[in-house]
A protein has these predicted regions:
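Soluble catalytic domains of membrane acyltransferases
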Residues: 82-234
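Membrane-anchoring hydrophobic helices of lipid-metabolizing enzymes
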Residues: 1-115, 147-152, 156-158
Length: 234
């Protein structure tokens, strides 16, 4: 209990502001990161140049700035999510577009919830689990105390979380067969020998084929989910 409270305080100190003011803080960090040409900037620039090679330099530079801004906001959202009460987190979601998931409470089939991972997966998962229990898999964090804290937070609403391995995949199939919902991020890196190499923008990339496999074997519908904050109030 003491360790849990210590970890929660640690994450709170790293995200002392509400999301609205926190985004302003994140945007200032973005300017610093761009000015210093940090590692995240270098990697994002390489990826954008590959994916948008046909676009002009001005377009790619603009996209780079927006990408870094979204990434840093995502980090802050995760820290915020890991240190706030459920009441505060519920107030952070201002609007839900297309309430399909909310209308599927009485069903006899499973659902595959697929996140584009454009923002914080933890904040999105937290919102989902206020509606129903969700089974999800995640790559374990190397620091044991941090890993246990994050796992407990993701399970606090009654949802099940398993590591990205054969056991975790088996649990996803079982949950779908029971008519429950499972959640995954589109860019989730599979464990060794559990993924495939596919061509992305002319390059071989190690990625997951679990999502189409889950769908083909269970016929569970795939629901795409994402978080957006087009302004400081969202």
């Amino acid at each position: 209990r003491k360790q849990y409270l210590t970890m929660r305080l640690f994450f709170y100190l790293l995200s002392p502001f509400g999301l609205r003011l926190g985004y302003v803080f994140c945007d200032l960090i973005t300017l610093v990161a761009l000015a210093l040409n940090t590692e995240i900037v270098k990697i994002s620039k390489i990826n954008i140049n590959i994916a948008y090679s046909s676009k002009n330099k001005e377009y790619r530079e603009s996209l780079l700035k927006r990408s870094i801004k979204q990434s840093i906001r995502s980090y802050y959202e995760t820290l915020f999510c890991l240190s706030r009460s459920q009441k505060i987190l519920n107030k952070s979601i201002f609007k839900v577009e297309n309430r399909f998931l909310y209308s599927q409470t009485n069903r006899d089939f499973g659902l595959i919830l697929l996140s584009a991972h454009n923002r914080s997966v933890d904040l999105l998962l937290n919102q989902l689990t206020t509606q129903e229990d969700v089974t999800a898999i995640f790559k374990p964090i190397k620091i044991k105390a941090l890993n246990e804290y994050v796992r407990k937070n993701r399970q606090k609403s009654g949802s099940s979380v398993f590591e990205t391995n054969f056991t975790g995949v088996k649990e996803l199939f079982s949950a779908l067969k029971r008519g429950e919902a499972v959640a995954m991020a589109a860019d989730q890196v599979p464990a060794k020998n559990m993924g495939v190499y596919e061509n992305f923008f002319g390059r071989k990339v190690y990625t997951t084929n679990l999502i189409p496999s889950l769908h083909s074997k269970t016929k569970a519908p795939i629901v795409s989910l994402a978080i957006h904050s087009d302004s400081l109030t969202k």
